[in-house]
Regions:
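Hydrophobic alpha-helical segments
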Residues: 6-9, 49, 157-160, 164
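Short, surface-exposed loop/turn motifs that are enriched in glycine and acidic residues
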Residues: 45-53, 80-87
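A short, structure-level motif marking secondary-structure boundaries and short turns
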Residues: 18-19, 48, 80, 113
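Short loop or secondary-structure boundary microenvironments that flank
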Residues: 1-2, 23-24, 49, 80, ...
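C-terminal substrate-binding/catalytic lobe of Rossmann-fold NAD(P)-dependent oxidoreductases
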Residues: 68-194
Length: 194
């Protein structure tokens, strides 16, 4: 929970213990605290530790810019009825991967007479219900064709398994602020993933 960052940060500063955080809902100031902790310990942050989501993010980073030229993009995410934040941290992370310079205005749902869709917007829709562990789909609507990229978590076990794998790969790293991509996909660590 974001409210626990201060005591956690004090502990990390005191001990130099490596940190893996998957907490979503941090403010930009709190993210700066995590980055600063990287000066005294190995710190890894990701809004989602699923390998599938990490791969989806890479796909969006690599192919998103060419798709945005000719396609309208909409993002739909689904989670259980107890999820507190919307859109989810993963949805925001995927939107950032697709549009890192925020050229698209992010529209949280639409309602009423809102007029024609602008080319410079990305609709983001959050559905909540039942026990859905997490689903994220990005739709690319073009002229006479639609492309979609999806990830569905059948259970929350994948997040724990990914965090454990990340912890194994973070072990022995020098102090620094690391991303999941750096840990999972760096050439030095690729062999260790097997």
């Amino acid at each position: 929970h974001p409210a626990m960052l201060d005591p956690l940060a004090n502990y990390i500063r005191r001990t130099g213990t490596p940190l893996i955080s998957g907490t979503t809902g941090y403010s930009e100031e709190q993210m700066d605290v995590l980055r600063q902790l990287g000066k005294s310990a190995a710190v890894l942050y990701s809004a989602n530790y699923s390998l599938g989501v990490a791969l989806l993010r890479r796909i969006l980073e690599n192919f998103g810019p060419m798709l945005l030229a000719d396609f309208d993009v909409e993002l739909v995410e689904k989670h259980h009825n107890q999820k507190a934040d919307a859109p989810s941290g993963t949805a925001k992370m995927l939107a950032d991967a697709l549009d890192p310079h925020r050229r698209l205005r992010r529209i949280s749902g639409r309602e009423g007479f809102c007029g024609a869709r602008d080319r410079d917007e990305m609709g983001m829709f959050a559905l909540r219900g039942g026990t859905v562990a997490g689903e994220h789909t990005l739709y690319f609507f073009g002229e006479d064709e639609t492309l979609s990229f999806s990830h569905s978590a059948a259970s929350r076990r994948i997040f724990a398994a990914g965090a454990v794998k990340a912890a194994e790969l973070l072990a022995g790293k020098d102090p620094g602020f690391y991303t999941l991509d750096e840990i999972l996909f760096s050439t030095a660590d690729t062999e260790r993933m097997d």
